[in-house]
C-alpha cells in the first residue's frame, strides 16, 4: 500500500477540482481567525450585529480566500492544480472587496479603522507573497 504525506492535516486527498478549492480555504485556520472577530464583538460594551456580520465577511474575504490564494500562488504549499490566473483573481478580488468593506465601515463608523484596513491589505499581500523573502 502506497501512502502520500498530505500537505496539511485537514487537506483532502487530491483527485478533484472542488477539493483543491476547499483545501485552499484552510478551513480550520479560517474559522480560527473568524472566531477572533466574534470574540472581539463579544467583549464590546454592546454588540452591533450588522457590524459583526460585515466584519466577518471582510475577514473571510481577506484571510479565508485572498491570503490563502496568494499563499498558494507563492510556492504551491498545498499542491493544488488551480490555474495561476485564477489564484491571482482569488487573491486580489476578495482582498479588494474586504478593503472596500473596511473603507465603508470607516465612513459609517469611525475613520480610526482606516489605518487597520490599509495595514491589513498591505500585510496580506506582502506576507503571503513573501515580498521580503522571509
Q: What name fits each language-model region?
A:
Residues 1-22:
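Short, Lys/Arg-rich, polar N-terminal cytosolic tail immediately upstream
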Residues 9-11, 21, 58, 62-97:
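Aspartate-rich (DDxxD/NDxxD/DxxxD) Mg2+/diphosphate-binding motifs
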Residues 22-43:
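The first (N-terminal) embedded transmembrane alpha-helix
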Residues 38-57, 99-115:
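Helix-coil boundary and interhelical linker segments in multi-pass alpha-helical membrane proteins
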Residues 45-49, 71, 75-79, 110, ...:
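Transmembrane helix-loop junctions in multipass membrane proteins, especially transporters and channels
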Residues 47-69, 113-126:
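Membrane-embedded alpha-helical segments that form the functional core of polytopic membrane enzymes
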Residues 83-134:
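Intramembrane alpha-helical segments
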Amino acid at each position: 500500500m502506497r501512502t502520500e504525506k498530505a500537505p496539511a492535516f485537514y487537506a483532502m486527498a487530491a483527485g478533484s477540482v472542488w477539493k483543491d478549492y476547499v483545501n485552499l480555504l484552510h478551513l480550520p485556520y479560517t474559522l480560527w481567525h473568524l472566531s477572533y472577530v466574534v470574540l472581539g464583538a463579544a467583549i464590546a460594551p454592546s454588540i452591533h450585529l450588522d457590524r459583526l456580520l460585515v466584519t466577518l465577511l471582510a475577514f473571510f474575504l481577506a484571510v479565508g480566500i485572498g491570503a490563502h490564494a496568494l499563499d498558494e500562488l507563492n510556492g504551491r504549499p498545498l499542491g493544488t492544480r488551480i490555474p495561476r490566473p485564477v489564484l491571482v483573481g482569488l487573491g486580489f478580488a476578495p482582498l479588494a472587496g474586504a478593503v472596500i468593506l473596511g473603507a465603508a465601515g470607516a465612513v459609517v463608523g469611525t475613520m480610526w479603522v482606516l489605518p487597520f484596513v490599509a495595514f491589513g491589505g498591505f500585510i496580506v499581500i506582502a506576507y503571503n507573497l513573501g515580498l521580503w523573502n522571509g
